[in-house]
């Protein structure tokens, strides 16, 4: 294991405070946009905190999964995955229920010439997600 890999593993170690918080959190966790820059690490950190807390709670991730191997990597960590295009209303409606939704989906890079898609991802989609998960706690997180 090289220095980068060691540092990455250290960052995935849940703190005592996180373990206590996740133990008190009601319901499962759904991460929309799990395939982005922050998603995989966040999903793994949540799953490790759940395991350390000794509780039974699902961590689920939704993405288009365009990165080869990511879906398998998340499965190996005990994270359920759901390939979906969040802009497709039928696919969004078919996603599992969750009391806790982390919204990480968005468009930041490669937006030149793709302004309409950027608008849809960053403006239209959050409203659709809020409607779909209106009975859930939603945290929107963006870089």
Residues of each region from the PLM?
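N-terminal Rossmann-fold cofactor-binding loop
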Residues: 62-66
């Amino acid at each position: 294991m090289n220095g980068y890999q060691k540092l990455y593993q250290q960052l995935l170690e849940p703190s005592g405070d996180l373990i206590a918080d996740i133990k008190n959190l009601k319901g499962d966790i759904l991460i929309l946009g799990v395939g982005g820059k922050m998603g995989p690490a966040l999903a793994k950190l949540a799953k490790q905190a759940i395991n350390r807390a000794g509780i039974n709670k699902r961590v689920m991730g939704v993405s288009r999964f365009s990165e080869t191997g990511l879906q398998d990597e998340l499965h190996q960590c005990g994270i359920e995955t759901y390939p979906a295009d969040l802009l497709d209303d039928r696919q969004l409606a078919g996603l599992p229920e969750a009391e806790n939704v982390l919204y990480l989906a968005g468009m930041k890079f490669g937006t030149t010439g793709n302004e309409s898609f950027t608008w849809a991802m960053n403006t239209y989609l959050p409203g659709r997600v809020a409607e779909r998960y209106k009975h859930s706690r939603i945290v929107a997180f963006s870089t």
